[in-house]
Regions:
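Structural/interface elements that position substrates and couple domains in central-metabolism enzymes
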Residues: 1-415
Length: 415
């Protein structure tokens, strides 16, 4: 069993920082690395730059204990965990530039028997590509693609499987898929994660581990697309979709998900494209689901325009510049501050670009993203009640008991 006294986590975002803090809380010395100097400075003060329940207290404690520190360049360690973004390009092809940068950053510090784990959700083959970049940078060391079980450096893929808002609990309780490039790589990775993981660590190969995470999120995306398409059909047929789903789900083998304004975040809205990019002819259902979910924000915008037209018809003395729309929620899901790929943010931006005055109610952020026009004002729940039209885009807990005029509401999440 391999002993890991010091690990280095590359990328201190929504996955990297909780992972680093959890290892530190279980007695491992952790050095976190991030290119964001502001984030590094905050962490070293025992503070956090992201919203995740209980993370602030955990980071404060492990920094105070000297178990966690942060810096902008890597350091020699026993193991490296890469948790950097993996976006896609404009043509929906995966962009591995952050993985490449991480590989080149850690390469000078590698030594015999080091373990490198790619946690970033990645297209099939990304772990092998990372190994190739490392090998190119360190020809003095051997890697699994060259030396198999006798390699100097061990490499694996272990995708995160946590739910934002419950990250700290699920890091410990969830099962982990561990895909080494060789069985020895897998076993070393299991030894590392068993420092804190109480769920099962299930061994496979790197390519299957990569595809497993993509499959999980594509399954979710396809099922959400069904719910979103159903909501559009029900609107056309004048049927309450929330009541319909509740009734249909009373069938013992039916479990329809809840519709929404689209699909956001850096996983479900992105990962299916990694499958489509590799197998475009075969992934027809997965592509169609992505198209359905990507189109939902435009449908929401059309519903708002209809509501605005009705308002102006009832108030002929006013123009569109006199209309105020309250958008409740900007995050991609409830009770977090993550705006990545958020359909709510996209809807708010496009409505503002129509010249409509927007009141944005997002209790989990302090400032608006720069991409929003100047006619968007960040305000609180009470101030939003002064709007002419309400659009509920995210099911934040603060919106649970909203008392809104039903004639003025477009409810996209069943609040």
């Amino acid at each position: 069993m391999q002993n890991f006294k010091h690990i280095c986590v590359i990328g201190l975002g929504y996955i990297g920082l909780p992972t680093a803090a959890t290892f530190a809380a279980h007695g491992v010395k952790v050095t976190g690395v991030d290119v964001n100097q502001h984030a590094v400075d905050l962490i070293n003060q025992g503070k956090v730059h992201i919203v995740e329940p209980d993370l602030d207290a955990l980071v404060r404690d492990v920094v105070a204990q000297g178990k966690l520190s942060a810096q902008i360049i890597p350091i020699e360690a026993d193991a490296y965990i890469v948790a950097v973004p993996t976006p896609f390009k404009d043509d929906y092809q995966p962009d591995l530039k952050y993985i490449e940068a991480a590989a080149k950053a850690i390469a000078p510090y590698l030594s015999q028997d080091n373990l490198v784990i790619l946690e970033s959700t990645s297209p099939v083959g990304a772990t092998e590509q990372m190994a190739a970049w490392l090998s190119e940078a360190r020809p003095d060391l051997t890697f699994p693609q060259q030396a198999g079980e006798q390699a100097d450096i061990l490499i694996a893929h272990c995708p995160e499987r946590v739910l934002p808002g419950k990250v700290l609990q699920e890091l410990i309780s969830n099962d982990r898929i561990v895909g080494g490039m060789t069985p020895r790589c897998s076993q070393a990775s299991i030894d590392l994660y068993k420092v804190f993981v109480k769920g099962d660590c299930i061994e496979t190969n790197a390519r299957t581990a990569e595809m497993c995470k993509l499959t999980e999120n594509s399954f979710r995306d396809v099922n959400i697309a069904f719910a979103n398409e159903l909501s559009i059909i029900c609107d056309k047929l004048d049927i309450n979709v929330w009541e319909l789903i509740k009734l249909a789900n009373r069938h013992p083998r039916v479990n329809i998900l809840q519709p929404g304004p689209g699909v956001g975040g850096h996983c479900i809205a992105v990962d299916p494209w990694f499958i489509v990019s590799k197998t475009p002819e075969q992934a027809r259902l997965i592509r169609t689901a992505r198209e359905v979910n990507d189109a939902k924000p435009e449908w929401v915008i059309d519903q708002v325009k209809i509501k605005i037209a009705e308002f102006l018809q009832a108030n002929p003395e006013k123009t569109i510049k006199d209309v105020t729309v309250a958008c409740y929620g900007l995050a991609f899901k409830p009770d977090i501050d993550d705006l990545r790929e958020s359909p709510a943010l996209e809807i708010t931006k496009k409505l503002a670009e129509q010249g409509i005055n927007i009141l944005a109610i997002e209790p989990n952020i302090k400032t608006l993203p720069q991409k929003l026009p100047n006619n968007v004002q960040l305000t609180d729940v009470e101030a939003g009640l002064e709007a002419d039209i309400y659009v509920v885009l995210v099911k934040h807990k603060q919106f649970k008991n909203l008392c809104l005029n039903i004639k003025k509401v477009i409810d996209m999440c069943g609040v």
